[in-house]
């Protein structure tokens, strides 16, 4: 007797949950910027809205690839109905918002911020910041001559509230000796404006190394390695991202620092390149 054939049936395909309906795109937002009506994308920041219209709002701590931290306060603008000036780099636009980017109140605030920076920080290798000082008529010299520079390690050893009160005769500064503890990078914190770009680039926004962070409080706040150890003993992988985002030259390649000191640095011979490699700052090519 011929056996009956055996039939194999493929199992039914697994059931899939119904696809979620697509969310409709948010409607554009109508705002008024410096007296001119504008329509911008929902969720855009005031800074993005201004730049799409060709308005120049200055920034120091902002970078498109980093999370806004609102620390420099140079990008503040005036918003109708708001008691305080708001940071344009992080404040999203709202329907009906009226924004002033260059009012007298805004200019006075930016001038004050720039005066405090220029009177306490060495901006000699930050031409962009120097241009802003001139643009807003800041007069850092009115705060008095610079106070004495801190001795090596003095600022690192300070504790909150334990430093001497200024006498008002001189402008307190962050001047201090350059840190040179390796053959690749130098750290000149006398030029640091605490924009936090290096901390973010070393952290979750780029490298995820977390070799540097902010230490101290108030005027004694500073960028430091963990435990204030020398850079070679820290978690630093020498990727160069911190140097790439530093706006003032506080973090610099040692070769550039040495060439500047010897008067051999030629800015016109420098060039930039676009890359997707997180280690491009190492200089493999």
Model-based region annotation:
Residues 2-17, 73-74, 82-238, 243-244, ...:
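Fe-S ferredoxin-like electron-transfer domains
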Residues 16-25:
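ABC-family P-loop ATPase nucleotide-binding domain
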Residues 24, 68-70, 281:
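Short coil/turn motifs at beta-sheet boundaries
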Residues 25-31:
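Short structural boundary motif marking the start of a folded domain
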Residues 29, 36-95:
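N-terminal cofactor/phosphate-binding cores enriched in small/glycine residues
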Residues 33-35, 225:
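Short glycine-centered, acidic/aromatic-flanked micro-motifs in structured strand/loop junctions
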Residues 277-285:
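Short, intrinsically disordered, charge-balanced linker/junction segments flanking boundaries
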């Amino acid at each position: 007797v011929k056996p009956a054939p055996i039939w194999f049936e493929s199992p039914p395909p697994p059931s899939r949950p119904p696809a979620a309906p697509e969310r409709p795109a948010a409607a554009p937002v109508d705002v008024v910027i410096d007296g001119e009506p504008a329509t911008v994308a929902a969720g855009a920041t005031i800074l993005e809205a201004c730049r799409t219209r060709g308005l120049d709002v200055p920034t120091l701590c902002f970078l498109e690839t980093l999370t806004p931290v609102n620390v420099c306060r140079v990008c503040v603008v005036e918003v109708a109905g708001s008691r305080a000036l708001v940071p344009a780099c992080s404040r999203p636009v709202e329907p009906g918002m009226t924004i002033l980017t260059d009012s007298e109140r805004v200019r006075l605030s930016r001038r004050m911020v720039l005066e405090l920076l220029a009177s306490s920080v060495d901006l000699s290798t930050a031409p962009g910041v120097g241009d802003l000082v001139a643009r807003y008529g800041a007069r850092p010299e009115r705060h008095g001559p610079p106070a004495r520079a801190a001795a090596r390690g003095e600022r690192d050893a300070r504790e909150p509230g334990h430093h001497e009160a200024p006498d008002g005769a001189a402008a307190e500064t962050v001047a201090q000796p350059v840190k040179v503890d390796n053959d690749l990078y130098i750290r000149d914190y006398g030029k640091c404006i605490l924009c936090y770009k290096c901390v973010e680039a070393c952290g979750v926004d780029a490298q995820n190394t977390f070799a540097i962070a902010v230490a101290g409080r108030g005027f004694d706040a500073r960028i430091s390695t963990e435990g204030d150890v020398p850079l070679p003993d820290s978690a630093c992988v020498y990727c160069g991202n911190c140097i790439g985002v530093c706006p003032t030259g506080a973090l610099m390649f040692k070769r550039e620092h040495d060439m500047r000191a010897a008067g051999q640095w030629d800015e016109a011979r420098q060039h930039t390149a676009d890359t997707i490699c997180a280690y491009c700052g190492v200089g493999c090519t």
